[in-house]
Amino acid sequence: AMFIDLFDESKDVYERIDAFKLGSSKLLERYGNGAAQHYQLENAITTYLWLRYPDRYYIYKFSEVKVVAAELEADYRFKKGAYADNVRNFIKLYDEICSMLQTDQELINLLRAQLTDTCYPDPELRTLTIDVGFYISRY
């Protein structure tokens, strides 16, 4: 039921993420045998969303998006513990980056030239956007 609710596109994305975290905490409490952590945080949960809907979602990583926003001098702010605002701002920022990438035909052609029949074609460039964010955050 947790994944069904997470993938319910009729609800706000952060509300779904938060509900998944809460459900994970309940499962940990009930079945965790004293384990301290369930590891179902925003990074893992957005990965599930991206794997299910690769043309709609990006993979969130707080440390990465914070650097990306700073490097691009974006108006979005990311603060530790501000989970809802951080995820919502992350999606807005990456949507902006993705929109810019979609206008760069040279980059799109470079991407397409590298794809094989076994590669996901990434028609909406969400995966490319994740890769660009990763690159910005590291270099």
Each predicted region: which residue ranges?
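Inter-helical turn/loop segments and adjacent helix faces that build the functional surface
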Residues: 71-81
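Generic structural signal for hydrophobic core residues of well-folded globular domains
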Residues: 6-10, 24, 31, 48-54, ...
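A basic, often C-terminal nucleic-acid-binding module that engages the phosphate backbone, implemented
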Residues: 80-139
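Helix-hairpin-helix/helix-loop-helix acidic hairpins
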Residues: 1-40
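Catalytic DNA-binding helix-loop module of base-excision-repair DNA glycosylases/AP lyases
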Residues: 37-70
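Context-gated lysine
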Residues: 11, 21, 26, 30, ...
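Charged/polar, solvent-exposed surface patches and flexible loops
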Residues: 5, 19-22, 26, 66-70, ...
